[in-house]
C-alpha cells in the first residue's frame, strides 16, 4: 500500500498505482476536506508490514475509522445554501442560539440606606443635591429646620429643584420648607426648577402655591429663566399657567428680547404664538424686532468682511 502525498490529497489526482486508498476529486465535495485529511493520516498505518500491526493498534485503527465515518455523515447532513432564504434561516438560527447563550444579568436593587447617626447641615444639603432621600429623611425626622442654607442662602429645596429630585422636593415641602425662600440673588424654588428644566418639579411647586410672578434680584421671572436656559417645556407650562409674557427685567428685556438675543427660534415662535408683544422697548429703546434687525445687520457685516478679505487674498495670490 502506498502513502498519499500532500499534493495528491489536495488536488485529488491519482498516481499510476490506482490503489483503492487514493482520493478522487469527488471525495472533496460538500465540505468533506476535514474527513479526507483524517483518513489520509490513517494511511500511514497501511505502510507498515502486516506483521508489525498489533491487536491494540488494529482496534485503535477501527475506532479512528469509525470516528471519521461519523464526522463524514455529519458533514453530509449540513444544510446546503441554495438560495437567500436558506441563508436567512441559518442567520436566524444563529441569532437564536446566541440569544439563548446570553445570560441576562440580574440587577439587584440597592438596599435602603439606614441612617442611625445624626446628620449635620453640610451632609443634609449635599444629600438634597445628590438625591439621597434616607439622609434627608433622617435630618428631617430629628426635627431640624428644613430651610437651613449655605453661604449663598441656597436651601436644600433650591438644590433639589435644580436637579429635579421630585421625591426630595415633596419630602421637604411636607416638612415645612418655604417655597418662597430666597437665596442671595433672591431666586425662589420656581426659578431654580426653571433653570434646571425640571417640569415635574415645576408643576409640583405651582400646585403647592408657588408665585409664578416671583422675581429675582435682576427682576427676572421664572419665564425669563426658562427662556434663557432653553427649557421649552417649562416655558410652555409657565405660559399655560398665565405667566406674564411681557414682564420686564432690570434692563427692560422681556422673555422675547432674551429669546431673540440668544437666537432661540422655538422660544421665539412659542412666545409670539401666545401673544408676546413685538414692539415692547427695553431700557436701551430696542424692541425684539430691532434686535432681529441688529443681528441680521451684524451677520451681514461679518459675511461682507469675510468676502472682502477673501477677495484681497485672491488678488495677492495672483501677483
Swiss-Prot record:
Induction: Down-regulated by doxorubicin (adriamycin), in vitro. The keyword Coiled coil applies. PROSITE patterns: ANK_REP_REGION, ANK_REPEAT. It is found in: Nucleus. Keywords: ANK repeat, Coiled coil, Nucleus, Repeat. It comes from the Eukaryota. Signal peptide: none annotated. Its main location: nucleus. One of its GO terms (cellular component) is cytoplasm. May play an important role in endothelial cell activation. May act as a nuclear transcription factor that negatively regulates the expression of cardiac genes. Interacts with TTN/titin and YBX1. This is Ankyrin repeat domain-containing protein 1.
Amino acid at each position: 500500500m502506498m502513502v498519499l502525498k500532500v499534493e495528491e490529497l489536495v488536488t485529488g489526482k491519482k498516481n499510476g498505482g490506482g490503489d483503492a486508498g487514493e482520493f478522487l476529486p469527488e471525495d472533496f465535495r460538500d465540505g468533506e476536506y476535514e474527513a479526507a485529511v483524517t483518513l489520509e493520516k490513517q494511511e500511514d498505518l497501511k505502510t507498515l508490514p502486516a506483521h508489525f500491526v498489533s491487536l491494540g493498534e488494529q482496534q485503535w485503527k477501527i475506532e479512528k475509522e469509525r470516528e471519521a465515518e461519523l464526522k463524514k455523515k455529519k458533514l453530509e447532513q449540513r444544510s446546503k445554501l441554495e438560495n437567500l432564504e436558506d441563508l436567512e434561516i441559518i442567520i436566524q438560527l444563529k441569532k437564536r442560539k446566541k440569544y439563548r447563550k446570553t445570560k441576562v444579568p440580574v440587577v439587584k436593587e440597592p438596599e435602603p440606606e439606614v441612617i442611625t447617626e445624626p446628620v449635620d447641615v453640610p451632609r443634609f444639603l449635599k444629600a438634597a443635591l445628590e438625591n439621597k432621600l434616607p439622609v434627608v429623611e433622617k435630618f428631617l425626622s430629628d426635627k431640624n429646620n428644613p430651610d437651613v442654607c449655605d453661604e449663598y442662602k441656597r436651601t436644600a429645596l433650591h438644590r433639589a429643584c435644580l436637579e429635579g429630585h421630585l421625591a426630595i422636593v415633596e419630602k421637604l415641602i411636607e416638612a415645612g420648607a418655604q417655597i418662597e425662600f430666597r437665596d442671595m440673588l433672591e431666586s425662589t424654588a420656581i426659578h431654580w426648577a426653571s433653570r434646571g428644566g425640571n417640569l415635574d418639579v415645576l408643576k409640583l411647586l405651582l400646585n403647592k402655591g408657588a408665585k409664578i410672578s416671583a422675581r429675582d434680584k435682576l427682576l427676572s421671572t421664572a419665564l425669563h429663566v426658562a427662556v434663557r436656559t432653553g427649557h421649552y417645556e417649562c416655558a410652555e407650562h409657565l405660559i399655560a399657567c398665565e405667566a406674564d409674557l411681557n414682564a420686564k427685567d432690570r434692563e427692560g428685556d422681556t422673555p422675547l428680547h432674551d429669546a431673540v438675543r440668544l437666537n432661540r427660534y422655538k422660544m421665539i415662535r412659542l412666545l409670539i404664538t401666545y401673544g408676546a408683544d413685538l414692539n415692547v422697548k427695553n431700557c436701551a429703546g430696542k424692541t425684539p424686532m430691532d434686535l432681529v434687525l441688529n443681528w441680521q445687520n451684524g451677520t451681514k457685516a461679518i459675511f461682507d468682511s469675510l468676502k472682502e478679505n477673501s477677495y484681497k487674498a485672491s488678488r495677492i495670490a495672483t501677483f
